[in-house]
Amino acid sequence: MAFAASHTASPSSCGGVAQRRSNGMSPVVAMASTINRVKTAKKPYTPPREVHLQVKHSLPPQKREIFDSLQPWAKENLLNLLKPVEKSWQPQDFLPDPSSDGFYDEVKELRERAKEIPDDYFVCLVGDMVTEEALPTYQTMLNTLDGVRDETGASPTTWAVWTRAWTAEENRHGDLLNKYMYLTGRVDMKQIEKTIQYLIGSGMDPGTENNPYLGFLYTSFQERATFISHGNTARHAKEYGDLKLAQICGTIAADEKRHETAYTKIVEKLFEIDPDYTVLAFADMMRKKISMPAHLMYDGKDDNLFEHFSAVAQRLGVYTARDYADILEFLVQRWKVADLTGLSGEGRRAQDFVCTLAPRIRRLDERAQARAKQAPVIPFSWVYDRKVQL
């Protein structure tokens, strides 16, 4: 996860790099100094890490026409992956019914089950929930993408309909996990709520440059990452004996898998009609490294909260550097990147880069694990400052 969480800008052949070169700018790592981080901790709407020199609108004008022409395809191939509201699960389906006579007994039973779950698992579950709760940021991010954004807030275009409906489906995830953890009594809800507010106020910097090629590559990767993460928290919950929590996490994972299918279909179509630019975009995102959506996470105390949460997730096997490599390898195979033909020289170099990257990531991870020392134990405000090993 530590590898997956990193995010640096780096040279590539996609449109954003051409813009960087034309502006005479070099790629930068957007990390504030310790002094700056101390200062920003006193500013309630500023992230602990400031983001600088963001590339904007790297999509060439002629590429935008592709997304206009894909509207009929998107209507036929994306909207059928959404579930009607009346057939969708809702958070209340998994929680004690407050109107029933047995409500208090059900809550007591839930709290008894939660007592058997260790703090490090709750750190992972809270981190996943906080990530889900920053949904306004993700809808905003999708609506920065040229050619597919919701221009009015209620646009009838297929891309806009998809984004709003996707957001509506995702909204249930954070709601359900939030209510469940509130009922457990195991976590500091005020600290969690502060973390959510900080995160939404901070935004995110995925490096997608208003470019839907980059944006849909990013969402393809992220939906698979969240599918894996929620699937692993479901497995752990079952091992701890909380079958209801396992069901909750598994149900959320199933949604993420369906959304992954949609976004990977979009990129598959882009590879079909515009393979050279798409493989350049793929290499661009992987050179930058995929930043996790909550990489600007902050709780008002820990300037490195996301890295600490990621380290616990890595140790527990909830989401790891190996998962990052596996996702990349899965996408390369899913999109048949190795089989692409007729590419430009730059396209062939990008193809080689993405097709050989996963094994390199695994080797780096193996070396890092071999050198790893005993991880420190630090307090997490989410669990009342109890100490958890990283």
Swiss-Prot record:
GO MF, one annotated term: metal ion binding
Listed GO biological process terms: fatty acid biosynthetic process; fatty acid metabolic process
Location of region: Disordered: 1-22
Pathway given in the UniProt record: Lipid metabolism; fatty acid metabolism
Binding locations of Fe cation 1: E132, E170, H173, E256
Cofactor binding note of this UniProt entry: Binds 2 Fe(2+) ions per subunit.
Predominant place of localization: plastid
Pfam families, per database record: FA_desaturase_2
Membrane-spanning segments: none
Known role: Converts stearoyl-ACP to oleoyl-ACP by introduction of a cis double bond between carbons 9 and 10 of the acyl chain.
Subunit structure: Homodimer.
Protein name: Stearoyl-[acyl-carrier-protein] 9-desaturase 5, chloroplastic
